[in-house]
Amino acid sequence: MITKPIPYGRQHITDEDIQCVIDALKSDYLTQGPKIKEFEEAFASYVGCKYAIAVNNATAGLHLAATALDVNLGDKVIVTPLTFAASANCIRFRGGEVVFCDVEEDTYLMDIKKLSRLLSQSPKGTYKGIVLVDFAGYPANLEAFRQLADEYGLWIIEDACHAPGGYFIDSKGEKQLCGNGNFADISVFSFHPVKHIATGEGGMATTNSKKLYEKLCLYRTHGITKDPALLCENHGGWYYEMQELGYNYRITDFQAALGISQLKRADMGLARRQEIARRYREGLSDLKGVSLPFVSDQVFHAYHLFIIQVEDRLGLYDYLHKNNIYAQVHYVPLHLTPYYRQLGNKEGDQPGGIL
């Protein structure tokens, strides 16, 4: 029996991380200061996008994305059933209707063939957008989804919370990093402690659209702006306007300072995750009844999770926990949770999402 517990996930904090937080705490700004902009610019550079907006968590980032993309009461948005609740809840926050589209059985990503079939069954204009998830760190082929989305006039939110640093190879043989803004309208990342970059709580939205960037910034801070270029009136340097009903989704400077420090080691963390995944494959490959995750040679997997399938899931779960190995199950199929059942979803829907 393993005596030292192995947790499901944990953050990696160095002395440099701690010093960066201390320095921020000793500065003149605890929030709304220069570290936030520095973090945003560093992250935008890392993923290769034009604009990045730091927020207090990824759920807030997804909510802002749905708001900036004008999801309104009754708008239908297509979401994968195999994801954390926030991927769909961000649509419900806006009064939108979530329509689930099943996943591929090998990658656990939204099945583009099933999506195409779903879209073809209704007139164009029935759906407003798609929320794609880079599940477990496996990057979705956003180029293919973008082509289909454009055919039906849909926007794309990429839930990239599992996949900073991940990428797929496009039709031209070029790397397309998750969150680079080339195909998704807005991408969202998480900085929860079990993720690649940890700030306690925190998130980032990325985009290549100046218009969407300005909307995200506005809604992040109560719908208030002091930017002279955006004001309806201008009464001097003190003047500000509340132009929309926004939120307080700001991150703090000391969290941003931690994020900046963590980001410097992001590639090292990815390499470590790749190494661990290789060890898992070597150790588990000969075991009967264990299905290992599929990985195409056209993607770089960020390995937030290493997903296996077994015949007796609960039995294995209980055995591992009794031996201080705290593995987890991801996820309870979202369409079968009590909340989404009451909206008309039922057993037998989305069979690929029931692992």
Enumerate the predicted regions with their spans.
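N-terminal "arm"/small-domain region of PLP-dependent enzymes with the aminotransferase-like
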Residues: 1-29, 34, 241-243
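Phosphate-binding glycine-rich loop
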Residues: 29-76, 90-94, 100-102, 171
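PLP-dependent aminotransferase class I/II
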Residues: 37-41, 49-52, 113, 129-133, ...
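Hydrophobic residues in well-ordered beta-strands that form the structural core
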Residues: 73, 79, 100, 156-158, ...
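Conserved coil-to-alpha-helix start sites within the AMP-binding
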Residues: 83-88
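Hydrophobic/aromatic ligand-binding patch that stacks against planar heteroaromatic rings
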Residues: 89-91, 148, 254
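Short beta-strand->loop structural element characteristic of the AMP-binding/adenylate-forming
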Residues: 97-107, 328
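Active-site phosphate-binding strand-loop segment of PLP-dependent enzymes
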Residues: 106-199, 204-212
